[in-house]
């Protein structure tokens, strides 16, 4: 049995220490280097470790933004336990419930759950999505007949970068139908891809 892994993954050496901090309910000072912006120290109450797309993420309460955030382990440059600060426990349900409305790990709290409808023009893509849905809410609305009579599917999620990335894999064989703001954002990304590659 083989599992997908990334042997060159940076930051996994922090996994054990972060897991122990979660179990021990310890407050951490994390040295974090975001993809955009300067490296900084963040006071963090760790709750959960999650893997997505061969990458590990630490979920917890970020004191700076007063909200739950996730930090990619490969961007954590170091951490230490902070004494004298009371640990703030997670007050929600289980983490399966927390992530149920998203593809991946990014939850944009200001973005509501939406029904994304799309057409599938290719039989291989249609069959692939039926047997390997990218989210548990993916539903078939109309079966595939031909490229002229495509399938219609829908997924009920909070739109985020990971959803767009998954749909871009199939961009040559699908058409986003609704909602229009998501459709326009998706089209803008496709136009940018074309501009970069012409």
What are these regions, as identified by a protein language model?
Residues 46-48:
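Short, surface-exposed charged micro-motifs
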Residues 1-33:
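Bulky hydrophobic/aromatic content
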Residues 65-98:
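Flexible linker/loop signature enriched in Pro/Ser/Thr and Pro/Gly
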Residues 55-59:
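Short aromatic-glycine-enriched beta-strand elements
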Residues 100-198:
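Polybasic (Lys/Arg-rich)
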Residues 35-37:
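Short acidic/polar, Gly/Pro-enriched loop/turn segments located at secondary-structure boundaries
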Residues 50-51, 168:
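Well-ordered beta-strand positions
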């Amino acid at each position: 049995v083989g599992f997908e892994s990334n042997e060159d993954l940076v930051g996994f050496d922090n996994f054990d220490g972060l897991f122990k901090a979660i179990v021990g309910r310890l407050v951490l000072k994390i040295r974090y280097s975001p993809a955009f912006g300067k490296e900084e120290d963040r006071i963090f109450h760790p709750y959960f470790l999650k893997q997505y797309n061969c990458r590990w993420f630490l979920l917890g309460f970020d004191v700076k933004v007063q909200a739950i955030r996730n930090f990619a382990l490969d961007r954590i440059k170091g951490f230490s336990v902070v004494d004298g600060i009371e640990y703030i426990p997670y007050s929600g349900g289980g983490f399966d419930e927390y992530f149920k409305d998203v593809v991946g790990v990014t939850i944009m709290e200001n973005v509501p759950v939406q029904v994304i409808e799309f057409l599938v023009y290719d039989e291989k893509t249609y069959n692939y999505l039926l047997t390997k849905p990218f989210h548990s809410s993916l539903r078939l609305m109309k079966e595939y007949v031909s490229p002229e009579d495509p399938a219609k599917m829908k997924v009920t999620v909070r739109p985020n970068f990971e959803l767009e990335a998954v749909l871009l894999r199939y961009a040559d064989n699908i058409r986003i139908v609704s909602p229009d703001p998501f459709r326009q954002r998706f089209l803008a990304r496709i136009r940018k891809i074309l501009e970069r590659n012409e």
